[in-house]
Amino acid sequence: MATEDLALLPIDIQDTETAGAFISFLEPFLPFSCGLIGLTQSHLTSQPDPYLKAWATFDFNYRSTSEVPKLFTVAVFTPIQGRLFCSADTSPEDVTAEELIHRERVVRLYVVTATSLIQTLPGHEEDSEYLLGVVHEKFFPLVKPYAGDAPTPPYRLFFCPPPDTEVIKTTVTGPDTSRWLVTGLEESDLELVRSTSHFQRTIEYLRTRIPTSACIRDPDSADGRRPVAWLMKHLDGSMGALYVDPDYRGKRLGALVVSECIKRLGENSVPDKFSWSTSTKFHPRFSEFFNHLEGWEAGWRTWWVRLDVVKHGRVVHRAIN
């Protein structure tokens, strides 16, 4: 498809078979597609979301292997946030002229599409912004002009291979669990979890993360269940909210809770193809932690961008049409 004819073609993501094929199609591009896969899976496995939308720059619904172009982009929209993934994200090479034009066109089309969809959401406000998450460093310069507020500082994405590989087995069996009680988070823990987070999260949201969490407890505490370290898998598939009580640091509880969370997820559901997390430069301890955590690798830079879809969506729509 010529760049001037490029379009975001809808994917019937509400169809179970098509949704499964969509995830399977993206898996060979892991870990670069992890943000998009995680967000899509969460909205497919939880209560069905009629507002989940997906597109590709080729006709995914009627594709064959020979028809998938080398350069393509897939995109996802949910009421909370969106994702973009370009096949060229996997390349260490600089952005080519062809790729630059492709990405620029995709971003413009996505802003227009998101603008239209946001206006259909319950509780829509005229001045709404829309969060585009885990924006790859190759996409960021093209997304930035559409931002409302200043984008977040860059986040480094860290990823870990699948639980059934040899490298992760070393991590999972690393710290000794015998001294500690390992559980998931519980309702009574949520206020503490919220109060220790750098990000504002509701109790309602944290409650949905209980099944995807791990919590290390001190059996020698007064009630025998004091939570001293925890981690959860977020809605987009990332591992986050990692916290270790200051009184218990230096005991490798961070590494323990990461490995236990991955194990619990593998026991309770289909194991993730990749585990991943992000860290900003303003949390150097977090970055240092993952840099030294066996089995984990530092990846590329990403950003979280709040698109001013009302302002820029109308402008872009006029420019395209």
Name these PLM-found stretches.
Residues T73, P227-A229, G299-W300:
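A structural microfeature
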Residues M239, F274-T280:
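Conserved hydrophobic beta-strand within the GNAT/NAT acetyltransferase core sheet
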Residues E99-T120, G250-E267, E288:
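Conserved acetyl-CoA-binding loop-helix of GNAT-fold acetyltransferases
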Residues A2-G38, D164-I203:
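Short amphipathic alpha-helix that is part of the acyltransferase structural core
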Residues R201-D247:
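A conserved beta-strand-loop-helix scaffold within acyl/acetyltransferase catalytic domains
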Residues A241-L256, P284:
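Conserved glycine-rich acetyl-CoA-binding loop
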Residues E137-G148, S269-V270, K281-T302, G313:
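Conserved active-site alpha-helix within GNAT-family acetyltransferase domains
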Residues S42-T177, T302-A319:
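Acyl-donor-binding surface of acyltransferase catalytic domains
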